[in-house]
Amino acid sequence: MQLSLALCLVCLLVHAAFRVVEGQGWQAFKNDATEIIPELGEYPEPLPELNNKTMNRAENGGRPPHHPFETKDASEYSCRELHFTRYVTDGPCRSAKPVTELVCSGQCGPARLLPNAIGRGKWWRPSGPDFRCIPDRYRAQRVQLLCPGGAAPRARKVRLVASCKCKRLTRFHNQSELKDFGPEAARPQTGRKLRPRARGTKASRAELENAY
């Protein structure tokens, strides 16, 4: 008799415990070890959303935003300046001392890669802008010319290259087939009106009709 009463009390306590758990939810019912009920368990707070710049994503094609070969400013390019020594001549007369000037040659490249920079590589693009090395500034120098036959020396003023620069050229500069080098192109035609050619109109119409 006492055993049956004890079993009834245990059943009532278990039933009351399940009622309390249903009222409070499954958040309070968890294992004391490491397990948490996945449906309504306690989850850690979500991490703050990272900025797009700090995430591991390829931007600008995997290159830094300011890539050397994508710049359009000619001041960021430089070219080699070769020193050239020569004598100034005027007929049979020649200068007593040679003069030194710069020869602008070579391909233009980023200033940070010239002349001896670490990390050289292919920085140009086939379809990119074309930069040419051209003279930038000139200087005037007076030289003394010595003539043979005991003639009196003469003085002459020459113009020498002082510095070079890179100039951006377009594709039109290299398309020589578009330029007319004939004698008619050298003479500007002023005061003349161009008249349409009447010859060959019938033949051209016949060719167009037979083309289809």
Curated annotation (Swiss-Prot):
Top-level division of the source organism's lineage: Eukaryota
Main location group: secreted
Record text on subunit structure and interactions: Interacts with LRP4 (via the extracellular domain); the interaction facilitates the inhibition of Wnt signaling. Interacts with LRP5 (via the first two YWTD-EGF repeat domains); the interaction inhibits Wnt-mediated signaling. Interacts with LRP6.
Disulfide bonds: 79-133, 93-147, 104-164, 108-166
GO cellular component, one term: extracellular space
Protein name as it appears in the record: Sclerostin
Residue stretches making up the CTCK domain: 81-171
Keyword Disulfide bond: yes
Similarity annotation: Belongs to the sclerostin family.
Gene: SOST
Keywords carried by this UniProt record: Disulfide bond, Extracellular matrix, Glycoprotein, Heparin-binding, Secreted, Signal, Wnt signaling pathway
SMART domains found in the cross-reference section: CT
Region (Disordered): 179-212
Function description: Negative regulator of bone growth that acts through inhibition of Wnt signaling and bone formation.
GO BP terms in the entry: negative regulation of BMP signaling pathway; negative regulation of Wnt signaling pathway; ossification; Wnt signaling pathway
Signal peptide extent: 1-23
Native source organism of the sequence: Bos taurus (Bovine)
Molecular function in Gene Ontology: BMP binding; heparin binding
